[in-house]
C-alpha cells in the first residue's frame, strides 16, 4: 500500500495484468521508455523508471521503488543516470515530473536532483488508491541548458 499510494495507476489485480502492462511498455513508441530497476545482488525487480517526451524539447520522468529499498539512495542514483542520459540528448532542454502534494519523499528526491518547484496543479491527477477524485500535484522541472 505504501508503494502504490501515490501512483497514477491502480495495483495490478493479477500477474496477467502485469504481463499486459509490460507488453504495452515494450511496444511503446520512441517517445516513451520504461526501465526495470533490478537489485544488484539478487537480480530481482525492485522498481521502474520512465521517460516520456511530451514536447520536442521536454521530457517527463517517472519512477517507483519497492518499499524495502526506500532510503538507500537507489532512486537518487537512477534519477541521476536518467538525467545524465537526457543531458546527452542535445534536443532535450527541459525535464519535468509531478508528484502528489502529500508525497514528501518524491518531492525531496526531485529537489535533491536539482529540480525546482514550478507550482501546484489543482485537482491535477487521480491517484486510484486515494479515491476517485482528482488530487493536487506538485510540478517540478529541471532546465538542462
Name every feature range the model reports, one short phrase each.
Residues 2-24, 33:
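Conserved GNAT-fold acetyl-CoA-binding loop/helix
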Residues 24-36, 47:
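A short helix-loop-beta-strand connector motif used in the catalytic cores of GNAT acetyltransferases and
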Residues 36-145:
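Acyl-donor (CoA/ACP) binding surface of acyl/acetyltransferases
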Residues 1, 25-29, 90:
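A general structural signal marking secondary-structure boundaries and capping sites
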Residues 14-17, 25-28, 39, 66-68:
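Juxtamembrane/interface motifs at transmembrane-helix termini
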